[in-house]
Structures are given as C-alpha cells and as structure tokens.
Amino acid sequence: MKLLRLAPENTKFPFMRFRRVSYPFSALLSIISVLLFLNVGMNFGIDFSGGTLLELRAKNGVADTAKLRSIAEHLKVGDVEVQGFGGPAEVIVRFGLQPGGDVAQQAAVNRVKNAIGDGYEVRRTEVVGPRVSGELVQSGTLGVVISIIAVLCYLWFRFEWQFAVGAIIATMHDLLLTVGFFALTRLEFNTTSIAAILTIVGYSLNETVVGLDRIREMMRKYRKMPTDQLIDVSVNAVIPRTIMTATTVFLALISLVGFGGEVIRSFSLAMIWGIFVATYSSIFICSPMLIYLGLRGDTVGSAPTPAATKPAKTRA
C-alpha cells in the first residue's frame, strides 16, 4: 500500500535562486507591518483594553445577537461587541470602560442587564480595569520575549552561530508579519492571541530546526559542494515533510474556524496565517541567510566516525 504524498520525491527546485526576490519582498512586508502597528494599532480586546464582559444564555431558543447588539448600542455604553460561542443559545456581550470609574462601570452593567430582560440568564460578569489590562499587556509581552530568548539560546549552542542568526531573523520576520496581520484585519487581540503568537513561534522554530539539521547533515557529507546548491538539495529533501505537516495543521485550523465559534476565531485565523508565514520563512529567509553569513561545508563540525557509530557486538 502506497503512502499518501502531497509532494513528489526527489524534487530539484532551485529555491536559493529566489533569495534576491524573497528578501526585498519580506523586508517590504515587515516595514508595512510596523507602519500598520504604529499608525493603525491593534484591536485590543477587553483583556488588554479593559471593560466589561457579560456571558449570557438564552432561556428559550437561540440567542438573537443582532437584537442584543441593538439594545447595548442604544444604551450608549461605548463600543459594543456581541459574539456567539459554544451553543446557539450562548452569547458574549462586551463593552468598554466607562468614564467615571468603578461606580459608572457598575451602573452601565446594571443598565445593560435590565435592558436585556428576563429572556437571558447572566452566567458570568467580568470587569477588567485599566490597571489589570496594563499588567496583562506587560505579562504577555514578557512571556513572548522570554520564550523566544530561551529557544534561541538553545539553537545558538546546538548549531553553528550562523544557523542561530538565521533562525532569529526568520522568527522575528514571522512575529512582525503576524502583528501586521492583526493590525490589518482588525481581529481582536486578546490572551488567546498571545497563545497564537507563542504557538506560531514554536512552529516556526520547529520548521527551521528541521531544515537546519538537514543542511548541517549534508554539509558534513558534501564539504566541497557550493553552499547554494547544497542548501537547495537539503530543502528539497525536507519539502515533502514540510508540505505534509503544514497541510495537516491547516486542515485542523480550518475546522476550528468553521466550528469553533467566535471565541477562538482570532486564534484560528492567526494560526493559519502563522503556519503559512513560518513555512515560507524557513525556506526563503532562514536558509538563504546561511549563504550571506558565509557558512561553508568545511566550517561545519565533522560527522561521527563509522567506528563511533557502529553498535558494539554482544557476546553470545
């Protein structure tokens, strides 16, 4: 029985030939992402901007999100978000912080509850103040930075320094483009978005390490081969695995977008974008960087000798 293959084996695609196009293209996208972040900004959710969240459940039938949105907007409590989640009877109503402090915020909560009426059960009320939201921003940013530094320190000691630099540049490229994606699409940026960014970083580094490990293996084997040709051979060797992995994860994320509800929609869409960007950067950003950093086959550590790798004979 033949195994399922999404890419042909023994391909000879000249990936490194496109490095003169991929680098300017990626630099342009990175600049656009930074400009979007600085000028447009992120659509911070209640976790980071502060405000009130009401989790409701319709007592009879399906929740009418359009009617709930109209009721909340009529009360003039600021920006209102109404999202379904879980079952058809469940809905979340969000609105921002009110001028006047805690007293004004609680008064707005009471007005919304009274306007909704007895048709809905209020299952949860959550108020996030500006101080708490600021602490969440700092904690989330610190968590992302620490995780990236820890993994990149591992790469620095695990591989040659050129490999670590290439991985750092590819990871920062993926982070910038993901931030730009959030700013452009206006997806709500909340704590699940932080989880998405950390997952994208992990996926990107995993794809990068797989490619770098194959490149190092080939450099030990073919020390005299030109670096660009050797990297092409290495990337072509792992491309079937890369396509299979990305496709599998992509199909799972499509299911989350279709059936997961609004609560994890931003996470799922960000992950889809991140998988695409991470796959691209591992091939067209990290690998060509080794050429520009002057990595050659004779600079890579020697492979283990056959005597060292041959298993010892056991006595009968």
What are these regions (language model features)?
Residues 1-316:
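A structural signal for conserved, well-ordered secondary-structure elements
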